[in-house]
Swiss-Prot record:
It comes from Oryza sativa subsp. japonica (Rice). One of its GO terms (molecular function) is metal ion binding. One of its GO terms (cellular component) is chloroplast. Belongs to the fatty acid desaturase type 2 family. This is Acyl-[acyl-carrier-protein] desaturase 3, chloroplastic. It holds the Pfam family FA_desaturase_2. The lineage of its organism: Eukaryota, Viridiplantae, Streptophyta, Embryophyta, Tracheophyta.
């Protein structure tokens, strides 16, 4: 997962309301210490009571910055989305289902199949299990991601919950495809017997209860850039997890992770196509939205991960993923470079304002800049003492090197 998404705790601050330029609203910042087990966002509870989410400071949240005239852009793309984006979806009857990759409970050999699965999984090291659980927990927070898409302005949200626009159909069908990922990985981990499922399930509930602020300001330009980045990041993460599983002798788990990675790759292609179309019809605003998104850095959707005890659970999970090469800072830089090239940002010329040209220069410089930072960090890491270990409740409190 992206290390840039792991933000250090900030000191408490007082309740205040501010207004950003352009009429955008900024939510109040609630004074909350990062103290686990005391209370939650918007739901103060007496000390000792279990909250819906851990106490966390909520930073200023900028909302609804999309200029009203930009809605016309998405209205004009409705037919294009129906013809170009919806075909990225697979018909349900042609789609894989979790049961296709799991022992069949109707089969007389079900017990033997489960025993074989557990025997293969016994060879997975604890640090790989941590990455697998972290990926699964991220997938299981799907309600949050569908909610995020339906907060976007510009006429792309599903206004009724069963809307007929191409944008609404896409969001629901995308979520339905994504839902299989967490289901499959959850059931697989349950059958392995290697993890503390109650702790994992608590983590999922806490994460959904905590929500996420992707800092996209309800702007679909920024929102679709964010989702493109995230789909590529998850495809990389699941693909690397698949390779690790294969190296440790669990070919079935490798197929599970590879299947999920392939779905994420297809979804990435759809979201990237949307942004490419926006660059075609509105290059100036789109490149400025790209720069705004990257200045905020792309926070991973599971960065509010919490298991009821560990305030730094995501940071530790991310450190393990970085050390194993499941998802690294180099991957983050690589995604930026890929998207800059995919959307033809260096070649933009006509139609750019002065601000647009500055945004173009900024995003084109980011990939190389992050790579240099990563190279320096790697050199420093070689000279540093071995990283400390930390316990993970997901694996019954066993220690894993960070």
């Amino acid at each position: 997962m992206s290390l840039t998404g792991c933000l250090p705790p900030r000191p408490p601050c007082s309740m205040r309301r501010r207004t950003s330029g352009g009429g955008a609203s900024v939510s109040p910042v609630v004074a909350m210490a990062s103290t686990a087990g005391v209370g939650g966002i918007g739901n103060p509870t007496p000390r000792g009571k279990k909250p819906f989410a851990p106490w966390r400071e909520v930073p200023p949240q900028v909302t609804h910055t999309l200029p009203p005239e930009k809605k016309e852009v998405f209205d004009s793309l409705e037919g294009w989305a129906a013809d170009t984006i919806l075909p990225y979806l697979k018909p349900v009857e042609e789609s894989w289902q979790p049961q296709d990759h799991l022992p069949d409970p109707r089969s007389p050999s079900f017990g033997d199949e489960v025993a074989a699965l557990r025997e293969r999984a016994a060879g997975l090291p604890d640090d790989h299990l941590v990455c697998l659980v972290g990926d699964m927990v991220t997938e299981e927070a799907l309600p949050t991601y569908q909610t995020m898409l339906n907060t976007m302005d510009g006429g792309v949200r599903d206004e009724t919950g069963a809307g007929g626009s191409a944008w609404a159909v896409w969001t629901r069908a995308w979520a339905a495809e994504e839902n299989r990922h967490g289901d499959l990985m959850n059931k697989y981990l349950y059958l392995t017997g290697r993890v503390d499922m109650r702790q994992v399930e608590k983590t999922i509930q806490y994460l959904i209860g905590s929500g996420m602020d992707p800092r996209t300001e309800n702007d679909p330009y920024m929102g679709f850039i964010y989702t493109t980045f995230q789909e590529r990041a998850t495809s990389i993460s699941h693909g690397n997890t698949a390779r690790h599983a294969g190296r440790h002798g669990d070919a079935a788990l490798a197929r599970v992770c590879g299947t999920v990675a392939a779905d994420e790759k297809r979804h990435e292609a759809a979201y990237a196509a949307i942004v490419a179309k926006l660059f075609e019809v509105d290059p100036d605003y789109t490149v400025r939205a790209f720069a705004r998104m990257m200045r905020r850095k792309v926070a991973m959707p599971a960065r509010l991960m919490y298991d009821g005890a560990d305030d730094r659970l995501f940071a530790r999970f991310a450190a393990v993923a970085q050390r194993l090469g499941v998802y690294t800072a180099a991957d983050y830089a690589g995604i930026i470079e890929f998207l800059v090239a995919r959307w033809g940002v260096p070649g933009l010329a006509a139609g750019l304002s002065g601000e647009g040209r500055r945004a173009q220069d900024f995003v084109c410089s980011l990939g190389p800049r992050f790579r240099r930072m990563e190279e320096r960090a790697q050199e420093a890491a070689k000279r540093a003492p071995p990283a400390a270990a930390a316990p993970f409740s997901w694996i019954h409190g066993r220690q894993v090197q960070l």
